[in-house]
C-alpha cells in the first residue's frame, strides 16, 4: 500500500490547496465589489472631465495651451498601470502585450519611448524588457488615492512641458464586467478632440472668466490626474475580477484532480486487497 499512501498524501495536499484557492476566491469577490463601488463613484467625474476637455479641444481659443497643440513626435511616453500582486490570470501579460504593440509601432518610426510605471508587476516586467522608466510607484493597496499618483503624473507632465516627450499615453485594463477586462491604450496628450460630430457642427465654445490661460493650466492638469486615477481604479476592479475567476478555476480544477486521484487510490486499494485475498487462498490451497 506504499503507492496508495502516496496517493492519500497527494489528495490531502490538493485538498489543502483547494481550501486556499477557495478562500482567495471569496476574498477577491469581496474586494471586487468594493473596487467596483470606488470605480462607479469616480467614473462620472472622469467621463465628464474627458467630455469637457474634448469640447475645449474643439474650441477656437486665442490662447493655445501646449497640451492642445499637435507637434512632431520624436519621443513618446506611456503611463502603464499594472497590479502589485499576481494570481490574476493573464491580466498583466495581456496589458503588457498591448503596450508593447503600441511601443513597437513608434520604435519602428525611430521614436524614443519612456515610461512611468504604476504597480510592481509593470516595474519588474519593463526592468527585464529594458525600457526607460522616468517614474515608478507601487504598494498603493486596495484603496489608492489620487495623492499616490501625483508624483508620477507630475514627472510625465514636466517631461511633456520640457519637450522630452511629444505624446503621452495611458495604458490600463478597462473593467467591462466580471468576465471581461479590456487592455486599453488611451492618448492623453496632446488632448484628443471630442468625437461628437453633432457637437462639432454647432461650433459653440465656453466663456472663460477672468481669462482662459489660468483656468486651462489648472484644468488640464486635473484632467490628466483624473484620467490616470480612473485608470488605476478600473485596473484594480479588473485585477480582483480576474483573480476571482482564476481562483474559481483553480478550485474547480483541484476538485477534478481530487476526483481523479480518489479513483486511482480506489483502484490501487482494490488491487492490493485482491492480491492479499489471492495470497490467502493460495496459502490455504497449499495446506
UniProtKB/Swiss-Prot annotation:
Entry annotated with the keyword Oxidoreductase: no
Residues that span the membrane, as ranges: none
Keywords: ATP synthesis, Cell inner membrane, Cell membrane, CF(1), Hydrogen ion transport, Ion transport, Membrane, Transport
GO biological process, one term: proton motive force-driven plasma membrane ATP synthesis
Entry-linked CDD domains: F1-ATPase_gamma (cd12151)
Domain of life: Bacteria
GO molecular function, one term: ATP binding
Topological relation to the membrane, as annotated: Peripheral membrane protein
GO CC terms in record: plasma membrane; proton-transporting ATP synthase complex
Localization, UniProt: Cell inner membrane
SUPFAM superfamilies cross-referenced by the UniProt entry: ATP synthase (F1-ATPase), gamma subunit
Task performed by this protein: Produces ATP from ADP in the presence of a proton gradient across the membrane. The gamma chain is believed to be important in regulating ATPase activity and the flow of protons through the CF(0) complex.
Summary of subunit composition and partner proteins: F-type ATPases have 2 components, CF(1) - the catalytic core - and CF(0) - the membrane proton channel. CF(1) has five subunits: alpha(3), beta(3), gamma(1), delta(1), epsilon(1). CF(0) has three main subunits: a, b and c.
Family: Belongs to the ATPase gamma chain family.
Family annotation (HAMAP family): ATP_synth_gamma_bact
Protein name, UniProt field: ATP synthase gamma chain
Amino acid at each position: 500500500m506504499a503507492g496508495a499512501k502516496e496517493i492519500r498524501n497527494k489528495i490531502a495536499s490538493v485538498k489543502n490547496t483547494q481550501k486556499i484557492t477557495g478562500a482567495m476566491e471569496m476574498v477577491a469577490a469581496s474586494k471586487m465589489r468594493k473596487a467596483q463601488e470606488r470605480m462607479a463613484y469616480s467614473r462620472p467625474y472622469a467621463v465628464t472631465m474627458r467630455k469637457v476637455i474634448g469640447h475645449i479641444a474643439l474650441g477656437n481659443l486665442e490662447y493655445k495651451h501646449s497640451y492642445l497643440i499637435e507637434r512632431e513626435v520624436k519621443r513618446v511616453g506611456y503611463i502603464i498601470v499594472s497590479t502589485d500582486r499576481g494570481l490574476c490570470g493573464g491580466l498583466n501579460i495581456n496589458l503588457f502585450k498591448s503596450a508593447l504593440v503600441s511601443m513597437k509601432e513608434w520604435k519602428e518610426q525611430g521614436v524614443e519611448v519612456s515610461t512611468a510605471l504604476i504597480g510592481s508587476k509593470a516595474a519588474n516586467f519593463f526592468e527585464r524588457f529594458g525600457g526607460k522608466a522616468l517614474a515608478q510607484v507601487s504598494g498603493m493597496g486596495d484603496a489608492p488615492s489620487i495623492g499616490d499618483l501625483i508624483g508620477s503624473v507630475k514627472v510625465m507632465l514636466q517631461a511633456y512641458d520640457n519637450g522630452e516627450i511629444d505624446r503621452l499615453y495611458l495604458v490600463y485594463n478597462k473593467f467591462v464586467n466580471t468576465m471581461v477586462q479590456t487592455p486599453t491604450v488611451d492618448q492623453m496628450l496632446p488632448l484628443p478632440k471630442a468625437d461628437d460630430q453633432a457637437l462639432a457642427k454647432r461650433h459653440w465654445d465656453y466663456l472663460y472668466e477672468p481669462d482662459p490661460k489660468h483656468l486651462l493650466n489648472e484644468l488640464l492638469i486635473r484632467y490628466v490626474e483624473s484620467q490616470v486615477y480612473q485608470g488605476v481604479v478600473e485596473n484594480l476592479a479588473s485585477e480582483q475580477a480576474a483573480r476571482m475567476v482564476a481562483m474559481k478555476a483553480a478550485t474547480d480544477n483541484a476538485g477534478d484532480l481530487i476526483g481523479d486521484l480518489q479513483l486511482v487510490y480506489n483502484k490501487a486499494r482494490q488491487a492490493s486487497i485482491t492480491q492479499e485475498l489471492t495470497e490467502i487462498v493460495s496459502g490455504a490451497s497449499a495446506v
